[in-house]
């Protein structure tokens, strides 16, 4: 069983080592972690997803007995709460339309028990888009990327190629000028339809298989 753990602890040397040591001693394997320091600089927030912990009560006792721990909570993992993610990047107007289609379709599947979330980044400029696409590889739980705009090519195309090679994340592109549509898995003319298809491509309760339409323009 995989669980989510949220910890607020003192921001000082050795704290993270101590906390992960407790998890290791209890047979826990950390599958995902994220940390950041709060604005005051004195407290750090640590989120971890852990599998293999059999004695939850002992975990609570060990964590709460640490002087460096200010708060500790066990909950469902983000994978279970938010599920797979549709990432939509590009020009604001096109991103909004794709998101509208994706959210409507995600609602249908989430009602049936799935968990699909939709993330958007309205952004323009080749360098900005290049960095955004490359960064998708570092995001957790990404199921598919949709690129929405009227012109994308150059470094953005290289970033798409690299993303697909490294992660295998499928990419849908709106019909646009530039070379990005040539390297996308699917090109869609209607932004609303692109959003719907993006969700269907990663939904377990849908029968759409993006691999069967690779390279097509809809």
From Swiss-Prot:
It comes from Methanocaldococcus jannaschii (strain ATCC 43067 / DSM 2661 / JAL-1 / JCM 10045 / NBRC 100440) (Methanococcus jannaschii). The lineage of its organism: Archaea, Methanobacteriati, Methanobacteriota, Methanomada group, Methanococci. Residues 4-83 form the ACT domain. This is Uncharacterized protein MJ1458.
């Amino acid at each position: 069983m995989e669980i989510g753990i949220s910890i607020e602890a003192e921001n000082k040397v050795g704290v993270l080592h101590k906390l992960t040591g407790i998890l290791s001693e209890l047979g826990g394997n950390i599958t995902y972690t994220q940390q950041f320091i709060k604005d005051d600089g004195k407290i750090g927030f640590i989120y971890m997803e852990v599998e293999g912990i059999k004695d939850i009560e002992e975990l609570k006792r060990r964590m709460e007995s640490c002087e460096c721990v200010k708060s500790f909570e066990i909950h469902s993992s983000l994978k279970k709460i938010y599920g797979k993610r549709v990432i939509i990047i590009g020009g604001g107007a096109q991103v909004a339309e794709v998101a509208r289609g994706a959210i409507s379709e995600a609602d249908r599947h989430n009602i049936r028990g799935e968990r699909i979330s939709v993330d958007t980044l309205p952004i323009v400029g080749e360098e900005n888009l290049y960095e955004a696409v490359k960064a998708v590889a570092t995001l957790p739980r990404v199921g598919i990327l949709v690129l929405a705009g009227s012109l994308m090519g150059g470094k953005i195309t290289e970033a798409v190629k690299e993303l697909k090679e490294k992660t295998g994340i499928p990419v849908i592109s709106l019909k646009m000028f530039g070379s990005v549509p040539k390297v996308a898995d699917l090109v869609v003319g209607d932004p609303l339809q692109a959003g719907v298809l993006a969700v269907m491509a990663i939904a377990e309760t849908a029968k759409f298989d993006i691999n069967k339409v690779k390279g097509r323009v809809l």
